[in-house]
Regions:
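Domain-edge interaction signal
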Residues: 1-199
């Protein structure tokens, strides 16, 4: 049986969780929905072409981001996290770090756009979450990860190491400074960029 090729956006989401990061251990968690969103956006913009040079997956098949109240946003990221959580591949737990107002507001916006029932208490309050693969998820992804080239694994590890521990505000600032077209609708532009945020 030949290894499964990386051929859809969900593969990248799972590989991002599986890949070692700064601590050099498989399945290092990613803290925060907003961080995960911005990591996938930056993957698309900065890493995808090099990472998937010979793959069938193209930018058109990946998460489609649009300028939104808190920078680049794709509803599909949250939907895919929920999809894998409901199937027992991803688990989330409360993170130790405090949630930024920006992250809570982005979550509230997703809830209003999603198919969640109004008043669903399990989804109404925002707490910063830490995402990782379950044992079932690790088992599912390990063959896919093993099929990556040495260069792909290196690129993914460097990318995750760089972004997983950076303060969220610094990550947001990087996105806002480098991808201005994705911040045209932002409600927090001035807060993120300070006095440089107004032009």
């Amino acid at each position: 049986m030949s290894p499964k090729p990386v051929n859809n956006r969900r593969d990248i989401l799972l590989l991002m969780l599986y890949s070692p990061g700064r601590a050099d251990t498989v399945n290092e968690p990613i803290t925060g929905r907003t961080r995960f969103m911005k990591m996938l956006f930056l993957f698309r913009e900065e890493l995808m072409k090099r990472f998937l040079a010979d793959a069938a997956l193209t930018a058109d098949d990946f998460y489609q981001f649009f300028p939104w109240n808190f920078g680049p946003f794709s509803r599909d990221v949250y939907d895919d996290l929920t999809f894998f959580e409901l199937r027992g591949f991803i688990e989330r737990s409360d993170a130790e770090e405090e949630a930024l107002p920006e992250a809570a507001a982005e979550w509230e916006r997703w809830l209003s756009m999603s198919r969640q029932e109004p008043g669903d208490s399990s989804m109404s309050e925002y707490d910063e979450q830490m995402f990782r693969l379950t044992d079932k998820g690790v088992k599912f992804v390990e063959d896919l990860y093993a099929s990556l080239t040495v260069n792909q694994r290196r690129l993914l590890k460097e990318f995750k190491s760089r972004l997983v521990d950076v303060p969220l505000r610094a990550l947001l600032r990087y996105v806002y400074e480098n991808y201005e077209s994705q911040t045209t609708r932002s409600q927090i532009r001035e807060k993120v960029l300070g006095s440089h945020g107004t032009r």
